């Protein structure tokens, strides 16, 4: 009986043993879980093709380049598995035959020759380092079993690919391939695959950059085994043995540092894949370094390149030199808020085209103006009188742009830009005003480049794509026709050529901007495929006298454009939209008139949007007699008379807006254009027949303040002439409209006073204030 019980107990014990082992293993697994995530984070930012841009090592200075199995050459996987662990895909974590072989070798030699570790066991040791003792080997085997229970073979292999040591601060095949060979691990040759497969066995002793002879011998050993096992042919192995151990110049990735720093905050991934083109980025950074010597002291630059066909950012240079503290090299000026100067002007003209306010040949007024305390002027400090919209844009004149913005509405303009991703930054509490169009608000270069894509994307502004998986998002800014017209004007092709003469591929269209005080110089260009954004200036905001958009930013823009064109093929065409047609309009009215019509003082060919011919845009104060359609009353002899004269008949004549009179040839001024006045029933009273004269100060007079006076008071009178008076002091309009004016002068210097009447007669006087 006791014997029977003993037998039964043995059978029960044997039957329960697997269950007990399972419970023990399960408990141990819970008590000592795998440290899968216990690693200091090391991150890398890469270009779209996988080229490393910038590495961010972990706290221990370790650099990793995360890869998947698909990212690695099959040659490397063949060499690794067949040299290190032929039975990797079949064993449960440890290979008993390998362990037995290693134990026999160690015993017979009296020293450790082989550890018999499988790839899984090597991963186990990487995750949980342990001493090379018998107990350590048991612990390693236990961790290997845990790996096999929790992970698939592919996951275990991926861990090895990313955690294996390759010498120095390099971990993983990705980091090793880029650091030693300057190439992706997907493109390894047989020789390179063999060398990197054996390197983790003794990374310090076999480092190819320090011990190329040792690395070559170890590589050849791997190659020979691949031939013996029939994995690679003898011919392949022979050719590979003849290859020298070639290494790329060992240099950690150093491209797009400020962009890479920004991307760390936009992605949690250890490997952040971006849309940058590594080759282009390298060219841009070389250009920046070469340009550094041309910049004034403490100045920097910024460049951004956007492929407007898919909105991917292809190049980003945030400063001229990251390591130059005197130039604030650590400040990324691509996303800094700066005054854009005149760079916004194309947008207001395009929006005004869609609104039906203007067409490209619309007559605008480049004349002195004052709106409250705001007195805009031009960059060259002069005024040009009558000018077309297209010429005003090409010459970047300020007063015409202010005139159009006033008609469109500054608040509406700012809201339109904000809606497509171009916010304008105003001082706290400030509302959008007319100064917006001249740089009176801040903007970012990256946002400006994104908005300029509207001129190449049929009027739709896209959102910049920084990573390949970012969705393509866009919003309408203006019509396709308006975008096409403005782009052609910026390319200096405003003339409406026949379709056969239009270039199929759009030339470079560009616009400059210079902020107040020469603090910022901008240039934005749009070519057939790319939008290029350029900024130069001092990051601290101090002025750089003489540095303006055309002189400082345009040469750099042209250099970048040449680089892009040398790399581009099959550029997209830019056909004329059906909404854009050719037309001929007349000045000063702005619309078509028949041949021979006396109201057509000048004919201009132009592009028209949807066939629209809006009349000339007037300033808010230009109504009635001060506008273009001028009413006159004629007697039976064709002479001008007052409206209430007997038998007076009314006619309408097109005249130029009064503020343009000083810039018109004599034959176009009202005094010549209007029929002579009747002496019997004069239109403005009898004194209107007298010439316009100025009295109160003689020409060339010297004016001095009375002792103790803060200003000199100068009363002036006009006589003769007709209708209202328009007064200008040094080209700036005065608010008075009467026959007399009193000047209050405080500043010394030369002065010119001009008075004009409603029929265009002019009287002037010059004097000096001392």
Feature-to-residue mapping (PLM):
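Glycine-rich, acidic and aromatic/proline-enriched surface loops and short helix-turn segments
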Residues: 125-129, 162-169, 186, 190-202, ...
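Conserved catalytic neighborhood of penicillin-recognizing serine enzymes
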Residues: 108-132, 186, 249-265, 358-413, ...
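Active-site SXXK
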Residues: 80-81, 226, 284, 311, ...
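Short, well-structured active-site flanking segments
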Residues: 89-99, 171-174, 234-236, 327, ...
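Juxtamembrane regions of bacterial inner-membrane/periplasmic proteins
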Residues: 2-297, 308-314, 319, 367, ...
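Soluble, non-transmembrane domains of envelope/secretory-pathway proteins that act on or interact
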Residues: 2-7, 15, 232, 508-770
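A penicillin-recognizing enzyme superfamily signal
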Residues: 274-295, 305, 316-319, 324-333, ...
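Mid-domain, small-residue-enriched loop/turn segments at the edges of structured enzyme/sensor domains
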Residues: 375-378, 409-452
């Amino acid at each position: 009986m006791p014997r029977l019980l003993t037998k039964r107990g043995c059978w029960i014990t044997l039957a329960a043993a697997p269950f007990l082992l399972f419970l023990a293993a399960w408990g141990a697994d819970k008590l000592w879980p795998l440290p899968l995530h216990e690693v200091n984070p090391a991150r890398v930012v890469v270009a779209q093709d996988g080229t490393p841009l910038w590495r961010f090592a972990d706290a221990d200075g370790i650099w990793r380049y995360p890869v998947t199995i698909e990212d690695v050459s099959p040659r490397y996987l063949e060499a690794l598995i067949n040299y290190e662990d032929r039975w990797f895909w079949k064993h449960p974590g440890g290979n008993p035959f390998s362990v037995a072989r290693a134990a026999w070798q160690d015993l017979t030699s009296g020293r450790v020759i082989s550890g018999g570790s499988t790839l899984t066991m090597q991963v186990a040791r990487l995750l949980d380092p342990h001493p090379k003792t018998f107990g350590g080997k048991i612990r390693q085997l236990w961790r290997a079993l845990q790996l096999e229970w929790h992970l698939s073979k592919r996951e275990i292999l991926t861990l090895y690919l990313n955690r294996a040591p390759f010498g120095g601060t390099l971990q993983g095949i990705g980091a090793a391939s880029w650091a030693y060979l300057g190439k992706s691990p997907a493109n390894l040759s047989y020789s390179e695959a063999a060398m990197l497969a054996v390197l983790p066995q003794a990374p310090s002793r076999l480092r190819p950059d320090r011990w190329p002879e040792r690395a070559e011998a170890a590589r050849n050993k791997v190659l020979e085994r691949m031939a013996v096992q029939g994995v690679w042919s003898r011919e392949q192995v022979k050719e590979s043995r003849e290859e020298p151990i070639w290494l790329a110049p060992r240099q950690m990735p150093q491209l797009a540092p400020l962009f890479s720093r920004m991307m760390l905050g936009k992605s949690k991934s250890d490997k952040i894949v971006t849309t940058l083109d590594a080759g282009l980025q390298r060219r841009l950074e070389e250009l920046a370094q070469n340009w550094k010597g041309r910049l004034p002291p403490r100045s920097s630059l910024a460049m951004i390149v956007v492929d407007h066909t898919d909105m991917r950012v292809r190049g980003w240079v945030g400063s001229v030199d990251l390591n130059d503290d005197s130039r604030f090299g650590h400040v990324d000026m691509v996303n800094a808020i700066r005054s854009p100067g005149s760079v916004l002007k194309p947008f207001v003209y395009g929006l005004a085209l869609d609104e039906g306010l203007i067409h490209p040949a619309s007559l605008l007024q480049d004349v002195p103006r004052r709106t409250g305390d705001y007195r805009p002027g031009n960059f060259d400090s002069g005024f040009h009188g009558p000018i077309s919209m297209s010429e005003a844009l090409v010459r970047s004149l300020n007063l015409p742009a202010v005139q159009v913005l006033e008609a469109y509405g500054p608040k509406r303009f700012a809201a339109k830009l904000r809606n497509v991703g171009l916010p304008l930054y105003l001082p706290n509490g400030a509302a959008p005003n007319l100064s917006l169009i001249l740089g009176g608000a801040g903007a970012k270069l990256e946002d400006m480049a994104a908005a300029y894509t509207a001129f190449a994307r049929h009027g739709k502004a896209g959102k910049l794509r920084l990573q390949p998986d970012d969705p393509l998002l866009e919003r309408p800014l203006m019509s396709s026709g308006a975008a096409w017209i403005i782009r052609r004007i910026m390319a200096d092709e405003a003339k409406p050529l026949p379709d056969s003469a239009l270039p199929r591929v759009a030339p470079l269209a560009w616009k400059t901007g210079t902020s107040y005080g020469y603090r910022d110089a901008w240039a934005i260009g749009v070519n057939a495929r790319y939008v290029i954004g350029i900024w130069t200036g001092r990051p601290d905001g101090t002025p750089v006298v003489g540095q303006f958009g055309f002189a400082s930013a345009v040469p750099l823009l042209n250099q970048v454009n040449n680089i892009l064109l040398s790399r581009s093929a099959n550029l997209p065409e830019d056909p004329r939209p059906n909404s854009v047609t050719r037309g001929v309009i007349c000045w000063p009215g702005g619309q078509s008139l028949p041949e021979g019509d006396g109201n057509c003082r000048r004919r201009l060919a132009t592009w028209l949007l949807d066939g629209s011919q809006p009349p000339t845009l007037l300033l808010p104060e230009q109504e009635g007699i001060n506008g273009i359609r001028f009413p006159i009353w004629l007697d039976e002899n064709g002479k001008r008379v007052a409206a209430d004269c007997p038998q007076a008949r009314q006619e309408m004549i097109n005249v130029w807006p009064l503020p343009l009179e000083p810039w018109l040839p004599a034959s176009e001024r009202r005094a010549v254009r209007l029929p002579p006045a009747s002496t019997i029933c004069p239109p403005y009273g009898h004194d209107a027949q007298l010439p316009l004269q100025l009295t109160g100060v003689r020409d060339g007079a010297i004016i001095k303040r009375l002792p103790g006076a803060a200003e000199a008071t100068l009363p002036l009178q006009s006589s003769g002439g007709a209708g209202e008076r328009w007064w200008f002091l040094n080209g700036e309009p005065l608010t008075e409209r009467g026959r007399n004016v009193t000047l209050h002068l405080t500043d010394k210097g030369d002065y010119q006073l001009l008075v004009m009447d409603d029929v265009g007669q002019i009287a002037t006087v010059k004097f000096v204030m001392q």
